[in-house]
Amino acid sequence: MIDDPLLLDACMHDAIELAQRGRFEVEPNPRVGCLLLRDGEVVARGYHEFYGGRHAEAMARAEAAQKGVRADTAVVTLEPCSSPQGQDGKKTPPCTEALLRAGIRRVVIGAVDPDPRHRRLGIQALTQAGVEVLEGVAARACEALYERFRRTVQLDRPWLLAKWAMTLDGKTAAPTGEARWISGPEARRRTHELRARCDGVMVGFKTAQIDDPELTVRLVSGKQPVRIVVDPLGEIDDDSNLVRTARQAPTWLLCSEEVDARRSGVLQDLGVQVIHVPTAEGPRRLHLQQAFRELRRRGLRRVLVEGGGGLVAQMFAWRCVDQVLAFVAPKIIGGRLSPTPVGGEGRPFMAEAWRLEEVQHETCGEDLQIAGFVT
């Protein structure tokens, strides 16, 4: 095993670069990178690739096993997790076990887990198993990597990703309300991939009424997310696709506490799970913070919001949007009656605009995909 602090620091910075490959895919989980070393030489690499996927340590261990190499040191940007699979919605086995099974004798850690529920438990599990733990290597760079994750831990709600498709002039539908299809097949396939990697997919009542969506994963293989409709008055049509298929795919309705028991009972008899939450600013607006906390309490950690503009505007007003993914199609619709992705009153001045950071642009078929985190 190596003791050169400069080499360990260089390895940790390499692990940080690896961790960044999970950007936009792993949230609300932290981005993590891992290097496995033998006698000072890197023999395997891993990173947390996407939400619900294997963690960095497991990926690195698999690569080492494939090569038939046994490492002695792990360099990892964040304290390895130790909680069992299934606890608090955890989708993967503990990384401490992966490292112990790999025969690792030393673990070099950049940052301690900022989540108070898990902080230092991974370190404790490793040291109790006789593994040497070295903390604080490239600590400042690793702490910076987890600034957003630290805020996420404190939110007590799911990670909320707002996604929309719009024309070049910023419209999400024609003046008639017709919106199929703005984006091309590649963007639609990517949307289905994203649905499969989320715990829930949410729309507002108007989108459910006008578009009559299914909100299921169809173009790719993957698990079906919980389908959620924000419907304060419980007005969703009993013959809508979402209600008709509620027994085939989980469907939740967020409505106000004022929706009577008879209406709630009708929906529940049709297979819809009705969740009552308090209102804010009148009966047609739910207290979104309370609604999202309830979703988190029920085990949802990552929710994709697919509109419409009214719901997304309310979420921005409540400061509840964490990430944005927009597909911009090379089409122009025009018309002052054509809806936009974010409705409401808007921001009064450009200086007050909601801004994105870590912005990423890439082509997706004929469309442009823009992703970023809301500041």
Residue ranges, per PLM feature:
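Enzymes that bind and transform nitrogen-containing heteroaromatic metabolites
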Residues: 1-27, 44-45, 64, 68, ...
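A broad detector of the eukaryotic-type serine/threonine protein kinase catalytic domain
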Residues: 20, 79, 104, 109-112, ...
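Proteins enriched for Cys/Gly/acidic motifs involved in redox and nucleic-acid/cofactor modification
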Residues: 24-26, 53, 123, 137-165
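Helix-turn-helix
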Residues: 33
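Zn2+-dependent cytidine deaminase-like catalytic core
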Residues: 36-141, 226, 252, 257-259, ...
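Generic signature of intrinsically disordered, low-complexity segments enriched in small/polar residues
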Residues: 40, 50, 54, 149-152, ...
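Aromatic side chains
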Residues: 47, 75, 146-149, 327
